[in-house]
């Protein structure tokens, strides 16, 4: 059974917002991965790259981790409709 995708065929809903947040915070993919690792999440630069290029699905744990790092809600990451916290 195929995994679900967005209406445009993407594997995740958050790639554009992750790029936007990372750039807003002047973070490279490597620095974001490092910050995630410091917070106990096993994500490396390659994971960030694959998420940002829609080549990888995002788990609930990863969504939580990214929400914590950027201090935004899950709703913002998924829908982009809610203001950042």
Positions of PLM-derived features:
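Hydrophobic micro-packing sites on short alpha-helices
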Residues: 32, 62-70, 77-78
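Residues that mark the N-terminal boundary/hinge immediately upstream of a DNA-recognition element
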Residues: 17, 28, 59-62, 73
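Short, charged recognition helix plus adjacent turn
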Residues: 2-9, 68, 75-85
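Short, basic-rich loop-to-helix N-cap that marks the start of a DNA-contacting helix
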Residues: 46, 53-68, 84
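Residue-level detection of the helix-turn-helix DNA-binding "recognition helix"
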Residues: 19, 23, 37-38, 53, ...
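Short alpha-helical DNA-recognition segment
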Residues: 26-50
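A short, Lys/Arg-rich alpha-helix, primarily the initiator
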Residues: 1-25
């Amino acid at each position: 059974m195929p995994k679900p995708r967005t209406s445009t065929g993407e594997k995740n809903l958050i790639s554009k917002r992750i790029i936007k947040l990372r750039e807003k915070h002047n973070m490279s993919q490597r620095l974001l991965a490092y910050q995630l690792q410091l917070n106990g999440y096993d994500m490396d630069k390659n994971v960030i790259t694959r998420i940002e290029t829609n080549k990888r699905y995002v788990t609930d744990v990863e969504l939580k981790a990214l929400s914590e790092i950027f201090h935004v809600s899950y709703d913002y990451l998924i829908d982009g409709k809610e203001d950042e916290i």
